[in-house]
Amino acid sequence: MAKKVAVIGAGVSGLSSIKCCLDENLEPTCFERSSDFGGLWKFAEASEDGMTRVYRSLVTNVCKEMSCYSDFPFHEDYPNFMSHEKFWDYLREFAEHFGLLKYIRFKTTVRSVTKRPDFSETGQWEVVTETEGKQDRAVFDAVMVCTGQFLSPRLPLESFPGIHKFKGQILHSQEYRIPDAFRGKRILVVGLGNTGGDVAVELSGIAAQVFLSTRTGAWVRSRSSVGGYPLNMMQTRWRNFLAQVLPSRFVSWNQERQMNKIFNHENYGLSIAKGKKPKFIVNDELPTCILCGKITMKTSVKDFTESSIVFEDGTIEANIDVVIFTTGYEFSFPFFEEPLKSLCTKKVILYKRVFPPNLERSTLAIIGLISLTGSILVGTEFQARWATRVFKGLCNIPPSQKLMAEAIKKEELIKRGVIKDTSQDKLDFISYMDELTQCIGAKPNIPLLFLKDPRLAWEVFFGPCTPYQYRLMGPGRWDGARNAILTQWDRTVKPLKTRTVPKSQEPASLSRYLKTWGAPVLIVSLLLIYKSSLFLELVQSKLQGRFSPSRILWYIPQNS
């Protein structure tokens, strides 16, 4: 008999969790409190039951080839970066293609999730739901929490002295949808993340003036890179390998140099404060808005008056009408009891950011409580792939006693300052995907690929690390993965080819040639230079009568 799995939430992680359950012959039931699927990607003029929704102008930050489900590419005519409407259309196509909608119970709120009395033997959960005022109870063999990390707005008003005196409008970005109501006003946006940058840029087109306050600064990236290709398509295994083997100081220095080549972040008031961790945001227009004076960068807020803001550097901005906090969200699981509720919000102690460490049975998975240097959608899909195989007993995780001991030890070390708290850091996309798929048995074997299929292996290692790579082998293998990888650049260029133009000759082809072959040629060149230097030393040693046969065998110079 198939195990029953409760999936809470029908957003991007909920949809992939339903599909992963079906792939493993589990029986999913998804509970969604709103009237439609898609989570925050389903735009609404006003929040439904306080749910977070996208603002109208939102455009994706990760290109389509790097942010799709691993066995369901975007259509080739979809733009590389798309509006929320287009992205929701993709989710609809995915749900309809795999027949996921029939497993979703809409307008159903999960009230409680509690362990059954025999949990230590069965791992079962009792889930209480409410639909139109009527409550229902059901027993499930496993639970996947897919409510995301944008439930409860973080509005730290107590951290801002004098804010109770401020007479203007105060709101969190969760309430922001369209800019029309802010026309002609002087606005302060607090917080420089992706949302803060987007909101400030959009408002700068109609506001009298926009001020953007940040404590730490940020590196601002464009969506496009060398040659106009999407920046994310430069995220390769080769680059990831270099970042791991090269000295971290050199990597940081080079990163800073590259960012400042585009524009000097210090001149624009965006540079990272000393001692702070590097933070990157994606925004194509923010530098131009600063350059044109539409947005004024400010330090952190020191004090509020009735209509003015005092900043840490002593400057004062008067006649402020609106303050918008883009200060993020708190993790919230109101349907859990303590201590499970608190443990699940501490993502740093979740085993591989998925499983709570204190459960005797690994039948509860927290899906999507991650920050990545790549697509969250892809990360949640692989979390779900792994979790469903754990539920089925095909993958194992360490005993709860061991996990809890390690979690407590880690928390103690963080409190004592021995190790850093990395809970707010973004995980490296490729490393985390490799880690999860290693558990599944779906991580691509690069050396084997080079032996069996050199063309594919080349694209896998030196090309963009697209999700299709993790469907080449192992459980969940997809027959279309190879073709998807070899045609990913075609789908990238296709939506741009809307006008017939004369074919460019040398510049474009040379650029592509250098991009493809430059790194390998450099490595080979360095090896040749190294071997040449050894050869010259051998010749010199021979001439000086210091020749040793071991030099030829090992290519290692010996002291005379």
Curated annotation (Swiss-Prot):
Membrane-spanning segments: 519-539
InterPro entries tied to this protein: FAD/NAD-bd_sf (IPR036188), Flavin_mOase (IPR000960), Flavin_mOase-like (IPR020946), Flavin_mOase_4 (IPR002256), FMO-like (IPR050346)
GO terms under biological process: energy homeostasis; negative regulation of fatty acid oxidation; xenobiotic catabolic process
Residue positions binding FAD: G9, A10, G11, V12, S13, E32, L40, W41
EC id: 1.14.13.8
Tissues in which the protein is found: Detected in liver and kidney (at protein level).
Keyword Membrane: yes
GO cellular component: endoplasmic reticulum membrane
Keywords of this entry: Endoplasmic reticulum, FAD, Flavoprotein, Membrane, Microsome, Monooxygenase, NADP, Oxidoreductase, Transmembrane, Transmembrane helix
Membership in a protein family: Belongs to the FMO family.
Name of the protein: Dimethylaniline monooxygenase [N-oxide-forming] 4
Species this chain originates from: Rattus norvegicus
